[in-house]
Amino acid sequence: RQYVAQALSDEAELSVAGQVVPLSVFCDTGFHLQEPLSGRAVVLVRLDAVSLPTELRAYLDACLAGVGAEPRPEWGVRFVPCQTVAGHCLLPALPAALGSNGRKQDGIYAAFCDMPPPPGGWTALVSAETAALLGK
C-alpha cells in the first residue's frame, strides 16, 4: 500500500482551548487516528508548533514526558491510542475544530505529539477523510 502526504493549505486554523492557532496542514492517506470513545476524527498537532495557555501547555508537556498529571475537567482531555513504527503510545487530545478554504470541521479532537519538525514543515496531519471534508 502506498501512502501519500500532501499540503492542504497554509491558511488552516485550529480552534482549541479557546485559542485559534494557524497550522500548516498535511493530508496523509495512511493517517487514521480516531478518538476511541466517540469515533471522532483526530488531527495530529506538533505541540512545539502551536501557542497554548501556559497551564495547558505544561499539562501536555507532562503527558508527553510520561509524567502523571491531572487535567482540568473543562479541558475535556481524552487519550488517543497511536501505533507507529516506533511503538504504541497514548496521545493527549482536546476538543477542537479545524478550518481551511472557507470550510470548518467541528467536533474533532486535536491530539498532540512532541516530534521534531519534519521535512516539509507541517504542524498538523489529517486523514484523507478530514481533508475531503475541508474541500481538498
Q: What kind of feature is each model-predicted range?
A:
Residues 1-36, 41-44, 51:
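Canonical alpha-helical transmembrane segment with a positive-inside/aromatic-interface signature
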Residues 39-76:
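Electropositive
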